[in-house]
């Protein structure tokens, strides 16, 4: 069980068998999430790590405005954290807490996946969480219509490439992007569809 006040969103495995996780905000204020304005930059959470012998601990230097997607480098030394309400991805040294780089993107970044080419892949929301909720959360819909973009980011230097920008037609509100071979596959907030775009 995750102890209060942690409110976990995304997780990523560490080489030693532990894992890191994004703590978005304290549970007691979680109901305010849909009232927040995009890119408000109000810091509410951070990244934590868990080990069987030590339990939960905060990773210093990871405070951010609604930390969402999180990944860790293959050697476990670097944490990559998407700050949903400050429209950026940040790389942090896991041991020292020092920021290695931070990169602004268009929209609010969601979950991160490491592609088979080693790049960081994620979608960003170009509509507010309130709009996403009103359009498709908890509703029986074929697909969500929220506009989104898809990014690839170089983990070494934070250089971003916007791969795709949608208008939400036929598939929208993407929450995950996974590169496999020549394609990037997309998940969504709701509906019964997955998306696919060509890989770079």
Locations of the language-model features?
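Beta-rich, blade/repeat-based domains predominating
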Residues: 2-19, 25-27, 41-46, 58-78, ...
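Residue position within the beta-strands of beta-propeller blades
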Residues: 20-22, 81, 121-123, 186-187
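Short, conserved, GDST-rich strand-edge loop motifs in beta-rich repeat architectures
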Residues: 21-42, 123-145
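Residue-level signature of beta-propeller blades and closely related beta-rich strand-turn architectures
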Residues: 25-26, 85, 126, 190, ...
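Structural signal for beta-propeller blades
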Residues: 28-29, 47, 87-89, 129-130, ...
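Beta-propeller blade signature
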Residues: 37-52, 142-156
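Short loop/turn segments that connect beta-strands within beta-propeller blades
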Residues: 50-54, 93-97, 154-158, 198-200
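Blade-level signature of beta-propeller repeat domains, shared across WD40, Kelch, NHL, RCC1
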Residues: 173-200
């Amino acid at each position: 069980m995750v102890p209060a006040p942690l409110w976990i969103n995304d997780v990523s495995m560490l080489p030693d068998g532990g894992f890191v996780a994004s703590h978005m905000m304290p549970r007691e204020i979680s109901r305010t999430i849909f009232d927040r304005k995009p890119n408000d930059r109000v810091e509410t959470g951070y990244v934590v790590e868990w080990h069987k012998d030590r339990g939960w601990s905060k990773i210093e230097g990871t405070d951010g405005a609604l930390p969402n997607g999180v990944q860790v480098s293959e050697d476990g030394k670097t944490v990559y954290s998407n700050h949903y309400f400050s429209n950026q991805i940040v790389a942090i040294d896991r041991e020292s807490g020092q920021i290695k780089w931070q990169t602004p993107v268009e929209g609010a970044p969601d979950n991160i996946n490491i592609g088979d080419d080693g790049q960081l892949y994620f979608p960003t929301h170009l509509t507010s969480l309130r709009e996403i909720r009103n359009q498709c959360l908890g509703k029986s819909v074929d697909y969500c219509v929220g506009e989104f973009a898809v990014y690839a980011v170089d983990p070494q230097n934070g250089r971003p490439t916007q791969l795709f920008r949608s208008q939400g037609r036929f598939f929208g509100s993407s929450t995950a992007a996974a590169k496999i071979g020549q394609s990037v596959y997309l998940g969504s907030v709701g509906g019964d569809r997955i998306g696919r775009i060509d890989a770079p």
